[in-house]
């Protein structure tokens, strides 16, 4: 014994032990390498040196954080229930009689207080220095046929310096099994340890160094013997009753003879102690096992002892020879007296023998690997079978109860490497089976390890089950990640096991907790273990040749929570589950931290191009099966569908050829027998949020979501995936085709057809629920409809009934696996359950929760395009009916039938809210959309019609660029609306327009058959509704027809003065438009030109149409008020030009040399081209030009208008108007008389009269412009040429026409300033009372004639023409001729005042009385005429095209009407346009005269009896008092009503209303008492009217905006 320890000390010094982290079983290889002599190391090949370096790096990267532990003598005793089993270093002592052996160290060590790590010489500088590394020792005593036991002890491996931690993370090594040699691969990951390492009494390294120190110092203390190096992970449960320590050593194969002392100790303690080798449960064991196989020993019988002496070497060789000669000696020891047991630690001894210990370690152990046998391949299947037969019943019984979780001695054939557990460490080198191991890894190698136990099977089972319940707990996530790692490509090409033969592992179902999926076990053929019998079926597995990989390499592995499942997944080599044998269900424990299997990337692969069905970029996510709710963790993947596999790659293929495609790192989804359908829960009611998601549920119970870009792409992927899935069903059915009868094959095909029908019906139902109405969807529905009819004929009635029940949602009636031709495999049953339970139950239930409150409303669809419910049920076996009742509007409800199944809306459905996009409507959020357009069904997917670019709008054909909506609207209008008065001018009903818009959005243009308008929606026959829809479409375009880029060029081109240059420029710009814009514009302009050809009927001339379409077609995208104000005239003028010259503008064959068409008469007059404005219009007035007018307006008011619009908020403009009104009122203290010279001018003064030509030119220039409010009146006014306008008339009449022109005060610079003050010379004629009376009478006649014409219309003008006096007739005719175009009353449609109002006015006139007036004072009197500059400001200077000017400019326009004798100079309250154009007072109540006090019947009475009245003084001024007549309080005030209030006795009430006094501000002079008495007398019935003096027009500005009423 002393000699043994002396040699041990020498070996330790020679090895120069340097600190390093050696864990688990990997140190065995290092120990033997370190113990070799120097000359052996020098003779080692370069390959071995490279392997040493690789293993050294591996061990360094996998270093745990170990450190020294408390010094010797301070052993910490833990209770069994308080110890943590995992991550422990196993040291057991065989000599239980020795106290030091009983207190052997158990556990691995981690010092949490060590600040740094020591390396190199720091660890060996002193003999008392504790090593900073971990070593694994196992004290064992192995009997050798009664000759005693050998004890092998060795030092650990040497690594001079550790690798740097900062370069790479602590890697995880994974194994991949193919036909080449094992090679562990390093993956940067697993950056922290799985869990803290357990603390024990003393470090095994410290314990061993203490032994060395005591031996070297001559200590006489007892030495613990029986130490042997365990080079591999130790099996946790061995058969202690077998008497053999089943510890395999794949490297250290030689034995060192030991004294019989240890043998005796072991014999004495054999009945008391049942030992069990323990292992650390770290995820690195596979890495060290890989390292061990890469570094096998070349010498089987010479090991460490060759350096120390030859005695033990000879003994070892003798042992090996003995083992070869008698293989049955070590396999059949049943005598307990001859058995040797492994000593257990004091901690473990507190357990119930070794049963509880072994059960506590259940399903976590790793058997010893005899990799030398695997490498050499010396054993054969036949040898294993023969050895198994020799073992007998007792051996089989012990094998069954060994329970090594697939790593035991069961002589079964499974797909995986064989982990042999041998009783000795010797290995035969002659190629025969070892005497101690009857199993060897060869072609289809069979493992048989002889280990026995004497305890009863029942007690073992019960103890094991109890222990399994105690040890089940959740694994940390880091541990799951480490043990679930997949494999790399380099291992695929380099690994080999058992001479290119695959082997498997037997798995006992009684020792694990949960069922292991058959996809993990592959073609594992589990053996039926029978207690009491040694018979077991052994079957050789199919060998893999070439580079063929196993199923476990291509398919993702479910996460294993312990090493047994991981090794099963790593080493099974069968790919297909052919169902040739009965599978034995395996149970596995699931971890709560497990991840989806396909999350782990597989190495690259090469695919055949002919097998690739489809590939593109998709968004993918995998969710846990059965999880509810949406997740947005989408990942971009390159999807490649090849046969029955879907490859999801991170990057697109880097290298492709004509025949192959090389994929990089990817995940693989098996779509064989998968369920493919639309993900209904991702459907959205908003088009902008619509997602096209495909759901794939595979047979291994994983769920994948794939998002495509478009609907057509989604449908094509569904079709291809379903065909691939059905091909998988057909392939699975053909496996047992020889065993199936003709009837069975018929049933299988029928059910396959039914399954295909089920897929197709689900797709149709999803399409119907999504309300997709595009052409692609219609074609798909038709094709699927035809396909289902064909499949319906092929399916028999029995299976048809089954499919009907399934599609109707009856989950209780489910077919068995016999429906698929009698296949009873697990995959088939899983597929059947997934198809029936998952998609029919879960998805339909989820779809019912997605319904919106409007989902059950009637769906307005064309019955001719959608099949009825009865037809749908007949063709799709009621699946479409069921889905339509669940996911979308029910067709049965629409047809008046009661649905068979209704979906109840859960509470979540009550909280359903309309999205923002749905509230705004599909037309881009128009403000006029009704509530019907705001609500969209949750299952609907409306296609927007409005708010879409021209290029994206649906068209009739590929060559046609005109949108379908434009063609439809134009077709309807040209068919039914050419003779409609006011077409495009009169708007349609807003609700009807929105209804048409929604109909087109939901159903598209397929339901609009213009050839059968009678059968369409009645709203399509309303031309006003259709015209409004067309204008709305143009207004909602994101980019107008004349694009933003060319818009400023069009504006500049329109302002070119020369006619031919302007047309050429406009045509050149038109040809620069995009093709869709150009074609659509040409289509519209040609249509508008056709409208103008019927203008005599529809009253829509070119300029009227330009007013309607100019702001919609010619506009910028960012409509701002300043641009609209300044460019309004240009916009309308451009459209007018295009309509006039459409043939020349859109002639694509024309060139620049073509002659320009002559200028159209209505095209206007350019400033540089005087004359030619219109037929019969004289020339000479340059200010009448439209462009000149616009330029003047733009230059004067553009900046001011923009500034005012910016200040439009907060009533700033209103305050400005009030301030201006107060400022102007202070200037109105002077008496301002009327500007009507014929009425107020004295005889001594005559106003300068312009020429008739000038007057006519101005009148024709301004009075004949566009009038949006009254189309017919404007046409009549332009067509009527009065002879009094062109022929010379009286000077007074000419002055009246000129001065009272409504556009006079609004024309910039067209007339001189008429604000003047001239003295009125007194003459002796005024002293004559008769002259006074004549002047007064003449004025009254002119005034009353105008009122009579206004009230009575044409009849009043005819009556006025019959006046007896020639002068009166001439004056009345002049006044009537001037105002005739403003007071047309030929049509009742343009009569503003009703008969009731006229009657009220007549009654008021009859009640009115005139008072006597005093004579006018003689002398000079200053008469001030109304200044034109007060009215000619920015508010009234707007182009005659401006129909919708800015709000600030039109809020409070100044009033030009102030008195009764100026009826025609008023602006229009009812119009928001302060343009200089003439207004038709009959269309607006704002231009009512301020005094309607005299009826036409009083005219003759006044003129005939005028001489009898008392003469009135010239300066006499009185106030007119009228009584307030009864009015309808609900009617809005007109000027007549307002003036009545002002002139009555309710002055305070009028002021309370905020209405300034607009009646004649007549101040009384001092009146004598006689006159006062005379005034108080009863009024005369024919009293003369007073002299009215006009007030300042600026004083009449309303105080607030409410007075616009």
Swiss-Prot record:
Transmembrane segments: none annotated. GTPase-activating protein for members of the Rho subfamily including Rac1, RhoA and cdc42 and other Ras-related subfamilies including let-60. Mediates radial (inner-outer) polarity and gastrulation by excluding par-6 from contacted cell surfaces; acts by inactivating cdc42 at inner cell surfaces which limits active cdc42 to outer cell surfaces devoid of cell-cell contacts, where cdc42 can bind and recruit par-6. Required for blastomere polarization. The record marks 985 as: Arginine finger. GO terms for cellular component: adherens junction; cell junction; cytoplasm; plasma membrane. It comes from Caenorhabditis elegans. This is GTPase-activating protein pac-1. Disruption phenotype: RNAi-mediated knockdown of isoform a results in mis-localization of par-6 in embryos. Residues 908-917, 1211-1229 have a biased composition (Basic residues). It holds the Pfam family RhoGAP. InterPro entries: PH-like_dom_sf (IPR011993), PH_domain (IPR001849), Rho-GAP (IPR050729), Rho_GTPase_activation_prot (IPR008936), RhoGAP_dom (IPR000198).
């Amino acid at each position: 014994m002393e000699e043994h320890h002396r040699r041990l000390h020498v070996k330790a010094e020679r090895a120069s032990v340097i600190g390093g982290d050696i864990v688990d079983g990997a140190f065995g290889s290092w120990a033997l390498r370190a113990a070799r002599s120097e000359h052996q190391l020098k003779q080692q090949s370069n390959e071995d040196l490279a392997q040493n370096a690789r293993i050294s790096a591996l061990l360094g990267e996998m270093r745990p954080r170990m450190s020294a532990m408390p010094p010797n003598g301070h052993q910490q005793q833990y209770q069994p229930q308080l110890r943590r089993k995992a991550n422990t270093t196993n040291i057991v002592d065989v000599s239980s009689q020795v106290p030091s052996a009983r207190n052997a160290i158990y556990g691995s060590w981690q010092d949490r207080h060590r600040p740094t790590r020591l390396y190199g010489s720091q660890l060996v500088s002193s003999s008392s220095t504790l090593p900073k590394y971990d070593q694994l020792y196992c004290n064992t005593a192995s009997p050798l046929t009664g000759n005693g036991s050998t004890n092998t002890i060795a030092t650990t491996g040497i690594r001079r310096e550790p690798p740097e931690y900062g370069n790479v993370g602590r890697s995880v090594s994974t194994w991949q099994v193919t036909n080449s040699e094992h090679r562990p691969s390093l993956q940067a990951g697993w950056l922290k340890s799985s869990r803290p390492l357990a603390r024990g009494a003393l470090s095994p390294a410290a314990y061993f160094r203490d032994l060395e120190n005591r031996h070297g110092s001559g200590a006489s203390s007892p030495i613990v013997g029986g130490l042997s190096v365990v080079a591999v992970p130790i099996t946790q449960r061995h058969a202690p009753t077998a008497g053999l320590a089943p510890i395999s050593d794949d490297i250290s194969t030689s034995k060192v003879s030991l004294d019989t002392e240890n043998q005796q100790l072991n014999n004495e303690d054999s009945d008391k102690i049942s030992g069990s080798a323990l292992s650390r449960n770290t995820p690195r064991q596979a890495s060290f096992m890989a390292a061990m196989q890469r570094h096998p020993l070349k010498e089987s019988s010479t090991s460490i002892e060759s350096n120390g002496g030859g005695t033990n070497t000879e003994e070892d060789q003798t042992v090996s020879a003995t083992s070869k000669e008698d293989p049955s000696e070590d396999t059949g020891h049943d005598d307990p007296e001859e058995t040797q047991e492994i000593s257990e630690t004091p901690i473990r001894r507190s357990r119930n023998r070794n049963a509880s210990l072994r059960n506590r370690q259940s399903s976590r152990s790793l058997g010893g690997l005899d990799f030398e046998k695997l490498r050499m391949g010396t054993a054969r299947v036949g040898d294993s079978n023969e050895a198994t037969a020799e073992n007998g019943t007792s051996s089989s019984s012990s094998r069954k109860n060994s329970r090594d979780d697939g790593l035991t001695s069961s002589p079964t054939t499974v797909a995986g490497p064989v982990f042999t557990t041998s009783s000795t460490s010797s290995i035969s080198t002659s190629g025969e089976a070892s005497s101690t191991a009857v199993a060897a890894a060869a072609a289809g190698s069979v493992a048989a390890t002889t280990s026995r136990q004497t305890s009863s099977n029942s007690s073992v089972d019960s103890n094991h089950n109890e222990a399994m319940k105690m040890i089940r707990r959740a694994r940390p996530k880091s541990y799951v990640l480490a043990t679930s790692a997949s494999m790399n490509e380099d291992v695929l090409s380099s690994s080999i096991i058992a001479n290119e033969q695959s082997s498997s592992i037997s798995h006992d179902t009684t020792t694990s907790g949960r069922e292991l999926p058959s996809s993990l076990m592959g073609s594992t053929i589990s053996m039926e273990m029978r207690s009491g019998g040694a018979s077991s079926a052994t079957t050789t597995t199919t060998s893999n040749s070439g580079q063929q990989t196993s199923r476990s390499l291509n398919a993702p592995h479910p996460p294993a929570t312990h090493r047994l499942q991981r090794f099963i997944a790593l080493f099974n080599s069968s790919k297909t589950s052919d169902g040739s044998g009965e599978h034995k269900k395996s149970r596995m424990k699931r971890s709560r931290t497990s991840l989806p299997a396909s999350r782990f990337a597989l190495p690259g692969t090469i695919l055949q191009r002919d097998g690739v069905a489809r590939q593109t970029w998709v968004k993918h996510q995998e969710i846990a099966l059965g999880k509810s709710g949406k997740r947005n963790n989408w990942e971009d993947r390159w999807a490649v569908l090849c046969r029955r596999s879907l490859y999801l790659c991170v990057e697109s293929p880097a290298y492709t050829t004509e025949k192959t495609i090389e994929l990089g790192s990817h995940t693989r989804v098996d779509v064989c027998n998968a369920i493919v359908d639309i993900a209904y829960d991702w459907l959205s009611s908003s088009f902008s949020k619509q997602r096209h998601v495909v759901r794939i549920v595979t047979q291994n119970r994983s769920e994948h979501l794939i998002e495509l870009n478009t609907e057509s792409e989604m449908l094509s992927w569904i079709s291809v995936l379903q065909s691939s899935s059905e091909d998988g069903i057909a392939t699975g059915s053909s496996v047992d085709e020889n065993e199936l009868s003709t009837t069975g094959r018929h049933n299988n095909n029928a059910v396959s057809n039914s399954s295909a029908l089920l897929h197709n019906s689900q797709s149709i139902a999803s399409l119907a629920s999504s309300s997709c109405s595009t052409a692609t969807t219609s074609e798909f529905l038709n094709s699927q409809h035809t396909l289902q009819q064909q499949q319906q004929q092929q399916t028999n009635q029995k299976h048809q009934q089954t499919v009907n029940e399934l599609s109707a949602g009856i989950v209780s009636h489910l077919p068995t696996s016999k429906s698929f031709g009698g296949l009873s495999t697990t995959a088939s049953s899983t597929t059947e359950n997934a198809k029936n339970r998952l998609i029919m139950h879960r998805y339909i239930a989820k779809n019912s929760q997605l319904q919106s409150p409007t989902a059950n409303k009637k769906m307005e669809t064309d019955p001719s395009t959608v099949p009825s419910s009865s037809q749908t049920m007949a063709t799709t076996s009621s699946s479409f009916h069921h889905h339509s009742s669940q996911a979308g509007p029910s067709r049965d409800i629409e047809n008046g039938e009661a649905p068979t199944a209704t979906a109840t809306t859960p509470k979540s459905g009550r909280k359903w809210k309309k999205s923002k996009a749905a509230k705004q409507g599909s037309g881009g959020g128009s403000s006029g959309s009704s509530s019907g357009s705001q609500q969209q069904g949750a299952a609907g997917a409306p296609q927007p019609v409005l708010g879409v670019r021209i290029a994206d709008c649906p068209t009739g054909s590929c060559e046609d660029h005109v949108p379908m909506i434009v063609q439809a609207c134009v077709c309807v209008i040209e068919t039914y609306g050419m003779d409609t008065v006011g077409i495009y001018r009169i708007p349609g009903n807003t609700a009807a327009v929105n209804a048409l818009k929604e109909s087109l959005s939901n159903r598209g243009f397929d339901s609009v058959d213009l050839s059968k308008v009678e059968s369409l929606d009645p709203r399509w026959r309303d031309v006003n509704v259709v015209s409004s829809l067309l204008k709305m479409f143009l207004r909602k375009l994101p980019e107008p027809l004349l694009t933003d880029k060319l818009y400023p060029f069009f504006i500049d081109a329109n302002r070119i003065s020369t006619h031919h240059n302007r047309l050429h420029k406009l045509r050149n710009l038109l040809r620069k438009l995009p093709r869709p814009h150009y074609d659509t514009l040409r289509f519209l302009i040609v249509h508008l030109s056709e409208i103008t050809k019927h203008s005599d009927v529809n009253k829509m001339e070119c300029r009227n149409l330009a007013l309607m379409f100019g702001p919609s077609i010619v506009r910028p995208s960012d409509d701002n008020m300043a641009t609209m104000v300044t460019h309004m005239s240009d916009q309308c003028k451009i459209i007018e030009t295009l309509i006039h010259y459409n043939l020349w503008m859109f002639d694509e064959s024309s060139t620049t040399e073509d002659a320009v068409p002559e200028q159209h008469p209505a095209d206007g007059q350019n400033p540089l081209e005087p004359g030619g404005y219109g037929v019969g219009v004289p020339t000479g007035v340059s200010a009448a030009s439209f462009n000149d007018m616009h330029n003047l307006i733009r230059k004067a008011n553009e900046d001011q208008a923009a500034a005012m619009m910016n200040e439009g908020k907060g009533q700033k403009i209103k305050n400005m108007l009030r301030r201006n009104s107060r400022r102007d009122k202070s200037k109105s203290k002077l008496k301002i008389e009327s500007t009507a010279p014929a009425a107020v001018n004295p005889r001594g003064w005559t106003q300068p009269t312009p020429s008739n030509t000038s007057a006519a030119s101005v009148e024709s220039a301004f009075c004949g412009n566009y009038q949006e409010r009254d189309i017919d009146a404007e046409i009549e006014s332009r067509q009527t040429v009065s002879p009094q306008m062109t022929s010379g008339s009286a000077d007074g009449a000419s002055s009246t026409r000129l001065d009272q022109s409504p556009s006079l005060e609004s024309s910039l610079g067209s007339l001189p300033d008429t604000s003047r003050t001239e003295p009125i010379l007194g003459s002796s004629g005024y002293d004559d009372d008769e002259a006074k009376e004549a002047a007064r009478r003449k004025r009254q006649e002119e005034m009353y004639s105008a009122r009579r014409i206004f009230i009575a219309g044409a009849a009043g003008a005819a009556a006025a023409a019959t006046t007896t006096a020639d002068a009166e007739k001439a004056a009345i005719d002049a006044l009537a001729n001037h105002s005739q175009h403003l007071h047309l009353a030929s049509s009742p449609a343009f009569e503003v005042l009703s008969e009731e109002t006229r009657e009220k006015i007549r009654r008021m006139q009859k009640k009115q009385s005139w008072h006597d007036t005093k004579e006018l004072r003689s002398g000079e009197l200053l008469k001030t005429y109304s200044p034109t500059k007060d009215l000619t400001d920015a508010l009234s200077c707007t182009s005659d095209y401006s129909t919708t000017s800015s709000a600030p400019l039109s809020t409070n326009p100044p009033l030009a009407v102030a008195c009764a004798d100026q009826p025609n100079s008023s602006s229009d309250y009812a119009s928001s346009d302060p343009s200089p154009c003439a207004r038709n007072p009959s269309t607006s109540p704002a231009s009512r005269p301020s005094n309607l006090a005299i009826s036409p019947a009083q005219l003759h009475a006044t003129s005939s009896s005028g001489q009898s009245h008392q003469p009135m003084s010239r300066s006499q001024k009185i106030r007119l008092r009228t009584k307030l007549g009864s009015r309808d309080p609900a009617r809005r005030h007109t000027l007549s009503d307002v003036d009545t209030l002002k002139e009555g006795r309710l002055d305070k009430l009028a002021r309370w209303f905020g209405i300034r006094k607009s009646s004649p501000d007549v101040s009384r002079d001092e009146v004598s008492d006689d006159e006062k008495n005379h005034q108080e007398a009863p009024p005369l019935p024919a009293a003369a009217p007073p002299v009215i003096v006009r007030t300042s027009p600026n004083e009449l500005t309303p105080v607030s905006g409410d007075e616009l009423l």
